[in-house]
UniProtKB/Swiss-Prot annotation:
Family: Belongs to the bacterial ribosomal protein bS16 family.
SUPFAM superfamilies: Ribosomal protein S16
GO cellular component: cytoplasm; small ribosomal subunit
InterPro entries named among the record's database cross-references: Ribosomal_bS16, Ribosomal_bS16_CS, Ribosomal_bS16_dom_sf
Protein's recorded name: Small ribosomal subunit protein bS16
């Protein structure tokens, strides 16, 4: 199954996350199909950038959103 979830980037204690489309059987930081945005919780205010067009496409072909991505994209 295809999922849209976060993959961790950055360095120790300074993480940021890419919002990626991947197979659900892959590891968290394993290979991904497409990167559709990023999320940086370490700055004030939090920086969220998502390609809405690509997000809508992947949802239309059956990709599931992780809980965190669903809450981020609803903001």
């Amino acid at each position: 199954m295809t999922v849209i979830r976060l993959t961790r980037m950055g360095r120790t204690k300074r993480p940021f996350y890419r919002i990626v489309v991947t197979d659900s059987r892959k590891r968290r930081d394993g290979g991904w199909i497409e990167s559709i945005g990023y999320y940086n919780p370490m700055v004030e205010p939090e920086v969220i950038k998502v390609d809405a067009e690509r997000l809508a496409y992947w949802k239309s072909v059956g990709a599931k959103l992780s809980d965190k991505v669903a809450s981020i994209t609803s903001k």
